[in-house]
């Protein structure tokens, strides 16, 4: 295998497994006092939780509120992408006009770069669209279970694309997640609240999340490794690609007939949803920066648990013991997978390389 193939294989492996270089994190942790770093981590994690949970509840309102009655999920997603593009361009202009005010890269739409990002944009559209469609057809309480197969797809794609085998214990945690998913589907059906359409969209969203991680790593060099440039091009491409979908699905006609089209409250909620969509990318990166990818996964799992409890309380739903068991299986399996992968990566890092051993033996 040549150097280029090895590099591509490493990139795909990092994308699927969520690994990163721990040396930078270790150095950063040594620079600041423990109390200050702990406070920063607590604030960043809290910001991530508030932003993520608020975005889910707000999107549920926009997509499936009885008081709103807006049946245009593609338009809602399109508008959120448009808000992100405008925010990126606005921050870029501010950074250019007032240096030092905000740290943001200069953004200029380059069609060549846009074409390079296009494969990722197609996957990105699938990810955010299927996410919103899943949320439209299922309750917030079941939303995490409906989208719980991302880890399973990560393992599957790592084998299909990298021929990377997974340890027995990691596969065991995946089987717990799958078991929790099917138990959740069964219990939703028993309670008469199951939407097979929403469940299918959740599975497709999970697949797209895994593919998005792969393509993000592959496309980053085209935007000089800048996440903000990638966000700008990704959402700009999405806005263009959404237009034929809006026409084909008749959502523009439905929007023109919407009674609250001229309501300031409606557009305020739509814009707020776009702001949360923009912010979640930033706070996710911030949480990974101040902790690690593995800690981010643990935080996401705990956040999902809190979100489920809040949804049940807010919507005043009564859930069976087996329904809660399915959620605990999904969350527990996800946490266990993160823990197993963390131990395996730590063990791999601690093991000396064969060539180093040979060299030391020769020196002796």
UniProtKB/Swiss-Prot annotation:
PANTHER family xref list: SOLUTE CARRIER FAMILY 35
Cellular component GO terms, alphabetical: Golgi apparatus; Golgi membrane
Keyword Transport recorded: yes
InterPro entries: Sugar_P_trans_dom (IPR004853), TPT_transporter (IPR050186)
Domain of life: Eukaryota
Organism ancestry: Eukaryota, Metazoa, Chordata, Craniata, Vertebrata
Protein known as: GDP-fucose transporter 1
Membrane topology, as annotated: Multi-pass membrane protein
Annotated localization: Golgi apparatus membrane
Main location: Golgi
Biological function: Antiporter specific for GDP-l-fucose and depending on the concomitant reverse transport of GMP. Involved in GDP-fucose import from the cytoplasm into the Golgi lumen.
Transmembrane domains' residue ranges: 34-56, 76-98, 111-130, 140-162, 167-185, 195-214, 227-249, 264-286
Pfam family name, one: TPT
Family of the protein in this entry: Belongs to the TPT transporter family. SLC35C subfamily.
Keyword vocabulary terms for this entry: Golgi apparatus, Membrane, Sugar transport, Transmembrane, Transmembrane helix, Transport
Recorded catalytic activity of this chain's protein: GMP(out) + GDP-beta-L-fucose(in) = GMP(in) + GDP-beta-L-fucose(out)
GO molecular function: antiporter activity; GDP-fucose transmembrane transporter activity
